[in-house]
Each structure stands twice: as C-alpha cells, then as structure tokens.
Amino acid sequence: MPAFFVTGTDTEIGKTTIAAGLLHAARRAGLSTAAAKPVASGCEPTAQGLRNGDALALLGQCSLALAYEQVNPLAFAPAIAPHLAAREAGVELSAARLHEAVREVLALQADLTLVEGAGGWRVPLQGRENLSDLARLLALPVVLVVGVRLGCINHALLSAEAILGDGLALAGWVANVVDPATSRLEENLATLAERLPAPCLGRVPRLEEATPAAVAAHLDLRPLGIGL
C-alpha cells in the first residue's frame, strides 16, 4: 500500500504538522493510516518512558493500533542532533537498525503510511551515514515540506536535487508558510512551483491553531495517487 518518506528543507519548518495533516486527510476519506518517526530527540520523561511530541502527534493520526515504541523506536532526551544524542547514550544509530524498525510499521499495509525523518535530508546518523540512507533502504517516494521563509527556494531546490540524486522519486511537496511576512511571498511560491519537479500537494498558511484538521483543509492527496 502507498507509503512515503517525509522530509523537510530544514528543522522546525513543520514536517510533523504537515504529516499529521496528510494522515488526517486520509482518515477523513475513510483510509487506514500508520506512521513512524524512527528517531527523535528532545523527548520528555513520562511514567511510560521518553515521549516525543512530534511522534505523539503522528500516533494520534494513526487509525491502526500502534504502540508508541513502534512509531518512535529510538527516543532521546537531549534536544540536540540525533547522532549526538545517540552517541551520548551509547546507542547504535544506523540506517539498518532504523530500517528494521520501520519495516514493522510498513508491514501493516495501511492505505497511507508516512515515515517522517528528523531535520532535513542530510541529517547525520552514525559513522558516515545520514537519514537519507534510511530513505534509500526503504526505497520510498519522498514528500518534501518546504518551510516558506527567506532562503527557502535555495533550500528546496538543493533538497530536491539531493533526493533525486539519491535515486528516489520526489512524489510531491507542500508549501508551509512559516513566515507570512516573507518578502515577495507569491513570487517565491510561483518560483517553487515552476522549479520543483513534482506536484504541489498544498499551500498551508500560518494558522492560529495548526490542528491536523485545519492543516488537512489545505492539502490535496490526489497527486499521491492513493485512491481518493
């Protein structure tokens, strides 16, 4: 069943907000959903163990029964780059290990499964590996979340170039307006639409409450071909 790897042009540009919106749109259409965020840092201690807000947001939009540990198998407390957090904790952070964990979620064969990365495309894992190596092992088409602000065109085009250069398909992109005061906003969006070699799945404005339902109202799943 359709599955996609969700990446972004940078950290803190709304990958999870958009991923949760995509999952909500699928659920609203009567489709089953599942998700994974295989590694997360900045997690909070709870009685059940470390929990990450982004992973919990994705879990909340999964229609299939999933344990938190299936969605987020590697959770670290320090709010630092995952490879640094893993090194401090003495934990293996290899693409192969993350691949095995994600395969468990993919095996559920939901109508839509999203695997969300951390940060951007070249976030380091251990050794010389990056999260992009996980995407390559999974061989999933990619959805790129573009945080629309100053510099986003360069970030988006470089990200798309890297994705395609790694042999993966760019299935679509979403314009997430993180800075509504961006100069020449409409011209920037037009340039992105012209230059990015994939369909735009939606333009999400800066929302007062960016709930999955509110975000989903600005998204279109049809270009992903998931049978809506």
Curated annotation (Swiss-Prot):
Active site: 37
EC numbers on record: 6.3.3.3
Annotated pathway: Cofactor biosynthesis; biotin biosynthesis; biotin from 7,8-diaminononanoate: step 1/2
Pfam families on file: AAA_26
Positions contributing to Mg(2+) binding: 16, 54, 116
Catalytic activity: (7R,8S)-7,8-diammoniononanoate + CO2 + ATP = (4R,5S)-dethiobiotin + ADP + phosphate + 3 H(+)
Subcellular location field: Cytoplasm
A GO term, aspect molecular function: dethiobiotin synthase activity
Chain sites annotated for binding substrate: 41
Role description: Catalyzes a mechanistically unusual reaction, the ATP-dependent insertion of CO2 between the N7 and N8 nitrogen atoms of 7,8-diaminopelargonic acid (DAPA, also called 7,8-diammoniononanoate) to form a ureido ring.
Assembly, per entry: Homodimer.
Protein name as it appears in the record: ATP-dependent dethiobiotin synthetase BioD
Biological source species: Pseudomonas aeruginosa (strain UCBPP-PA14)
Organism lineage: Bacteria, Pseudomonadati, Pseudomonadota, Gammaproteobacteria, Pseudomonadales
Gene responsible for this protein: bioD
